[in-house]
Amino acid sequence: MIKKRLFIGSSSEELKTAEIVKEVLLKDFEVTIWNDNVWDTAVFKINQNFLADLLKASLQFDFGILIGTKDDKVMFREVEMIQPRDNVLFELGLFTGRLGTSKCAFLIDKEIKLPSDFNGLTLARFDSTNEATVIAGANSIKDLFLASADDEINFFPSATLASVYYENLIVPICRFIIDNNGFTKGDTHYQKCKLNIIVPERINQDVNLQFEKLKGLFTTENVSFKYSGRPRQISVDTQIKNDTLEFIDFPTIITGINHAISNLLPNDFNKQSPDYSSILDRELRRFITTLKKLLIRGGFDEMVNVKRDSEL
């Protein structure tokens, strides 16, 4: 089973704390620590290349933990206060916006006072003089992340496309079968029906051509039917196997994943790089995961199989 990827952001002065947190999480997650060394070499603490890396990272990780420590002194209403580094707060905002509040957490020193804007975020406090409190905070965040990993649908491009595909094709087919106690094809009524959704292992540049090659592995016949409330006919390929009518669909909607990711990344990002391929692969897995969650929620999971082309 592929481990979920987790990002830890901290100041370079608190790498020891980040390493403790990483040790707690390594059993359940693939963990990467990002510290602020790169910020120290950037113009005004920020540049386009670094932002590109952060945007890329926010698409490559499933969860984020930002560690807030007593790094900077600031004056607030004529009172001296201690706050985390600006870059840590920036990363917290970026990852929370991208991943959602249930998949991003702030592990923060107990002596830091946070503004009310942080209400609603997942917070865990620790005492910088007591390692046990760091471990306890990391464990509480770990439990939250593990609990949220399989029961939420986020709105990454892949999840949005999966939701559209589910509502516009899967639901009409399944409801039509249920309402009609099967499906009539020609002179034969089939009570046993199944929908097979075939998803490729990777997304090629021309997804339509990719699916046409996959369709060559099947001997199918196209059927169409009118679904209540829809202005158009639903059209889908079918085959008969073991007295079961199998609907077969190749979701060309996944073409949108490539376009969406391209728009989310900087224009000069290398679309041929391993990092880009990694992001696409992750989104394809999210597409499948989201579909399976929606099928369970809708009660259609026993009627639908989602397969990778390698399983054919």
Swiss-Prot record:
Gene Ontology annotations of biological process type: defense response to virus
Subunit structure: Forms homodimers; in the presence of c-di-GMP forms filaments with an ordered array of parallel-stacked subunits.
Record-stated family: In the C-terminal section; belongs to the bacterial STING family.
Record keywords, A-Z: Antiviral defense, Hydrolase, Nucleotide-binding
Lineage top rank: taxon: Bacteria
EC number: 3.2.2.5
Free-text note on domains in this protein's UniProt record: The N-terminal TIR domain mediates NAD(+) hydrolase (NADase) activity. The cyclic nucleotide binds in the C-terminal bacterial STING region. Upon binding to c-di-GMP the STING region closes around the ligand, which is bound by residues from 2 adjacent subunits. STING-STING interactions are the main drivers of filamentation; rearrangements in the STING domain allow reorganization of packing of the TIR domains, forming the NADase active site; cross-filament contacts strengthen the assembly.
Catalysed conversion reaction: NAD(+) + H2O = ADP-D-ribose + nicotinamide + H(+)
Annotated TIR domain residues: 5-127
Known role: Effector protein of a CBASS antiviral system with NAD(+) hydrolase activity. CBASS (cyclic oligonucleotide-based antiphage signaling system) provides immunity against bacteriophage. The CD-NTase protein synthesizes cyclic nucleotides in response to infection; these serve as specific second messenger signals. The signals activate a diverse range of effectors, leading to bacterial cell death and thus abortive phage infection. A type I-D CBASS(GG) system.
GO molecular function per UniProt: NAD+ nucleosidase activity; NADP+ nucleosidase activity; nucleotide binding
Organism: Niabella drilacis (strain DSM 25811 / CCM 8410 / CCUG 62505 / LMG 26954 / E90)
Enzyme's top EC category: hydrolase
Gene: cap12
Activity regulation field: NAD(+) hydrolase activity is strongly stimulated by c-di-GMP, weakly by 3'3'-cGAMP, very weakly by c-di-AMP but not at all by 2'3'-cGAMP. Self-association of TIR domains is required for NADase activity.
Name the record gives this protein: CD-NTase-associated protein 12
